[in-house]
Swiss-Prot record:
It comes from Pseudomonas putida (strain W619). The keyword Ribonucleoprotein applies. HAMAP family: Ribosomal_uL13. The gene is rplM. This is Large ribosomal subunit protein uL13. CDD domains: Ribosomal_L13. GO terms for cellular component: cytosolic large ribosomal subunit. Keywords: Ribonucleoprotein, Ribosomal protein. One of its GO terms (molecular function) is structural constituent of ribosome.
Length: 142
């Protein structure tokens, strides 16, 4: 029997909606990253993007354990000398709640062109409303 490898043109992708309200950041991000890669499917192939589309709602209600809400730092750099910026979890969740989940998931995906394609299938929204009702996403319990 020959080994099966998925072809990019035959991959069937589904849309799922995940409610992040009350979920722990890391546990939610690992499951999302796994589904974006397609590792939950029997036809998973490492060099082919077999993952599904994931829509995350209520990103502003995500939680972290312990003192991470004040201690967890996010860093960015402008590229200029002395241009490092830092912001903690509390301030980032108030300023841009989508970025918290996006950053966590992006760090769990491959750092190559295939990983960037997988990351583009992630849609994160701060509130409960999202513009993807036409795709008829199924609810995913995590």
């Amino acid at each position: 029997m020959k080994t099966f490898t998925a072809k990019p043109e035959t991959v069937k992708r589904e849309w799922f909606v995940v409610d992040a309200a009350g979920q722990t950041l890391g546990r939610l991000a690992t499951e999302i990253a796994s589904r974006l890669r397609g590792k939950h499917k029997p036809e998973y192939t490492p060099h082919v993007d077999t993952g599904d589309y994931i829509v995350v709602i209520n990103a502003e209600q995500i939680r972290v354990t312990g003192a991470k809400s004040s201690d967890k730092m996010y860093y960015s750099h402008s590229g200029f000398p002395g241009g490092i910026k830092e912001i903690n979890f509390e301030k980032l969740i108030a300023k841009a709640p989508e970025r918290v989940i996006e950053t966590a998931v992006k760090g769990m995906l491959p750092k190559n062109p295939l990983g960037r394609d997988m990351y583009r299938k992630l849609k994160v929204y701060a509130g409960a409303a999202h513009p993807h009702t036409a795709q008829q996403p199924q609810e995913l319990k995590i």
